[in-house]
Amino acid sequence: MRVIVSFKRALAVWGVLALGLTVLAPAWAQQGTAPFRIGVLPNVSARLILTSYQPMREYFERELKRGVEIATAQDFRAFAENTRRGDYQLIVTAANLGRVAQADSNWQPLAIYDPKIPAILVARADNPNASVAQLRGKSLALANPQSLVALAGLQWLGSQGLQNGTDFKTVTAANDDSLGAVLGTGEAPLAIMSMGEFRAKTEAMRSTLRVVTEIAKLPGFLVMANPALPAAEQQRLKTLILAFPQTEEGKKFFALSGFANIRDVGEPELKPLDAFNDATRKGLGG
């Protein structure tokens, strides 16, 4: 199901949007020009995406002089499929998903978000055990199993002598209720998520959790252009996204989202992501 709403109405219907959505800017459709679609990875709730990306929508709408949509999907798999199908003109996606989109569908990397993303190991606040050995025979909770954070976390656990599928299994806990349930019952004594995902949780939920350790700092989100766009338009989009941090809209975006910068990115920085390509494709069902 696709839902299109104005920004003014969005906060009232965010629960509907979370099902797999498109969020539309004000009344540009009457002008007869198809909206420019920016796809944003659903690593947090639709409501948070809509709110934090409003300044970016306004910026591109002004610069492109056309309607702009901020769109997301129900989950990582759906977002990756939408990307492969070319549903968006521009995407903001996890670095590993972006690298696979580049390799398999020729999406073009334009920029990368800073700072790097901390991958963290989390437990209930009343669980004093800091050893990963407590996972043996139990489950590890993952917010987004296809994310670079999850893949890097599983790799790190392997280096600690714990193999997924042998020593423990994984369970998806994409929302506060499911995370609270699996951690609270002891089914999953530990969870892996990004610091951004942790901070996006309600204060009440965060108060029941503690960060056990930081596993790694990983590359930030990639901004990528649809390969079907003409080269000149791709270059224009790159110029616009690299100029965005210096604008008033950019400053508002960083204040809302917690990101600090959007900068140029090149092959030397992207090449190490190839180590996660096969695991990413497997996680996406490819």
Summary of predicted features, one role per range:
Residues 12-23:
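Bacterial N-terminal signal peptides
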Residues 30-96:
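Extracytoplasmic small-molecule ligand-binding "clamshell" domains
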Residues 34-43, 49, 115-123, 148, 152, 204-257, ...:
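Periplasmic-binding protein-like
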Residues 55-64, 111, 150-172, 199-206:
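Ligand-binding cleft/hinge of the Venus flytrap
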Residues 70-81, 94, 165-181, 217-219:
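Short helix-initiation/N-cap motifs at beta->coil->alpha
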Residues 92-104, 159, 182-209:
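A ligand-binding cleft/hinge motif common to bilobed small-molecule-binding domains
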Residues 123-140:
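Flexible hinge/capping segments at coil-to-helix
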